[in-house]
């Protein structure tokens, strides 16, 4: 089981949010966003790892953010199985709205809230506050969603500074 932790420096850490995505970059960014909002944040690489984490830590996770497009076990199946383990768990599905299969996937999981990816910091904060009933308490500035800047030289012969 691969679980990534985000340490949140807070005297009174918020509820535990588990971020599950098979892609490293969005998983890392969303996990850092959750942590910077003052919530405890953990992440797992896929549905199986998330279920193992939930079984090893019963009733500790308050909210699950799961990507719909994961192989082997999509986020909807994970959400259903996670709710079987802990009915009070709040499960939220994430996906890119441009995904041509999104409507088919969502129709099978209509009972779960949805967050479009890429996730904006403001939208995530609003959604978590509303679903958890606990205001976010940002501990740091939001992580950047911008791609890393290239350090290549410009074709005009000028250097980036």
Report each predicted region and the residues it spans.
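Receiver (REC) domain active-site loop signature in two-component systems and cognate sites
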Residues: 70
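Short acidic/polar segment at the start of the alpha1 helix of CheY-like receiver
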Residues: 23-27
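Non-catalytic signal-transmission and effector/linker regions of two-component phosphorelay proteins
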Residues: 1-18, 28-31, 55, 59-60, ...
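As written
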Residues: 75, 105-115
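Active-site residues of response regulator receiver
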Residues: 67
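Helix N-cap/capping motif at the beta->alpha junctions
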Residues: 43-52, 75
């Amino acid at each position: 089981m691969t679980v990534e932790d985000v340490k949140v420096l807070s005297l009174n850490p918020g509820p535990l949010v588990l971020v599950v995505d098979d892609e490293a970059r969005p998983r890392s960014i969303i996990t850092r966003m959750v942590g910077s909002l003052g919530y405890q944040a953990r992440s797992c690489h896929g549905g199986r790892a998330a279920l193992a984490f939930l079984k090893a830590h019963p009733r500790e996770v308050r909210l699950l953010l799961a990507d719909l497009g994961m192989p082997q076990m999509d986020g909807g199946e994970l959400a259903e199985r996670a709710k079987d383990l802990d009915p009070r768990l709040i499960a939220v599905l994430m996906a890119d709205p441009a995904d041509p299969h999104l409507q088919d996937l969502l129709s099978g999981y209509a009972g779960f809230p949805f967050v479009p990816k890429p996730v904006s910091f403001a939208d995530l904060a609003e959604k978590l506050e509303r679903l958890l009933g606990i205001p976010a308490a940002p501990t740091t500035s939001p992580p950047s969603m911008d791609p890393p800047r290239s350090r290549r030289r410009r074709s005009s012969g000028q250097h980036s500074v």
